[in-house]
């Protein structure tokens, strides 16, 4: 293993005018709080880079590694359905692009790195609370198999940062194949610079959709893949019970990654209209609205791409979104029920169960995990005691067991399949809050313990991580402030 990773700078070299070069602004008395050891190993990084005793170094923006060329990218976007103009990157700096030994290229993005020319009225900082939440969420989603940016390190400090209250400044090193957002394209479309839209699209195709690079119709084919990836991501969110909270177009990844973890939340009680962001007064980004918002955001991206793709082709590709969404959602939800063969009427079993869960406020994650224990030849179910309306549950469960018998699968094999898609553990807000409170005392032990559990969310476990949330943790409100 080399002493230092190798960095290249394709964004800087190939896209002049898309960024401003600058270096991070360090925090006061910054120090490394935690690092993601499995990710560090995948990135071929030596352990000597992670020094918990000395200065924060590269993790706190105090030094740069050889080959790094730090810059802030420029992008715009729609926020809560309204064009907001230029938005960022107001506190994040792309330090460089790491070239791995297998040829893979990954961004190193330092969040909370200080003011940039795109900071608007912001202070360029992130607080410890939000960096811990993003660190945990990105690794939780990765553990669930959902496309996401990753988190490598958290640095804490003695720098005070004002939000609703005064909090501790922090930085997070985010790793991703790309940080290109829908809003990057919108920025140049609204600036009436269609040649820049084409230039950026060509860059994205060459670096991230190389199989399309030689196609004459490459721009349309690429947009079609973005539509499909976005539809599949929305389906995955719905199936695991994840609410993003702030699906503005500048928070949408061109690669179909979950990114920009802010006021997110995983469902506790199954509430289809769950709103995790307490500043989302109209419920625009409520849980059950997310698939529709995904399409709306794609329509905004299509508008930005209209200088390089004919309108009729864009509309035809957008029409593929709903079928792709329903296919992926249906595939994943059938697996959650233990159905490996698609049959007419399968959606009825799901709709009836979800209706009962919504009426009774059943815990989303626990219900499907307990359903995984079903024995098709037994009328008894541990899930029965979770419902007040047991007559309705009994009637549904009898039909469900009959449907399972049609699968012809032994209980053990089916239960293994169901447990591989129905997690025992998700990152509930109260679990994150407990880790945050410890981290604010410079104690990373709960953060490390929770992180280890989130890496294996499908494993059988019986501890406080899988119990119902306590009363104080059931309806925690989360805001956009970070």
From Swiss-Prot:
InterPro entries: adnlytase_SelO, SelO. ATP binds at residues 88, 90-91, 111, 123-124, 174, 181, 260. It catalyses: L-seryl-[protein] + ATP = 3-O-(5'-adenylyl)-L-seryl-[protein] + diphosphate; L-threonyl-[protein] + ATP = 3-O-(5'-adenylyl)-L-threonyl-[protein] + diphosphate; L-tyrosyl-[protein] + ATP = O-(5'-adenylyl)-L-tyrosyl-[protein] + diphosphate; L-histidyl-[protein] + UTP = N(tele)-(5'-uridylyl)-L-histidyl-[protein] + diphosphate. Keywords: ATP-binding, Magnesium, Manganese, Metal-binding, Nucleotide-binding, Nucleotidyltransferase, Transferase. This is Protein nucleotidyltransferase YdiU. It is an enzyme of class 2 (transferase). Mg(2+) binds at residues 251, 260. GO terms for molecular function: AMPylase activity; ATP binding; magnesium ion binding. Belongs to the SELO family. The active site is at residue 250. Its cofactor is Mg(2+); Mn(2+). NCBIfam families: adnlytase_SelO, PRK00029.1. Nucleotidyltransferase involved in the post-translational modification of proteins. It can catalyze the addition of adenosine monophosphate (AMP) or uridine monophosphate (UMP) to a protein, resulting in modifications known as AMPylation and UMPylation. Pfam families: SelO (PF02696). Its EC number is 2.7.7.-, 2.7.7.108.
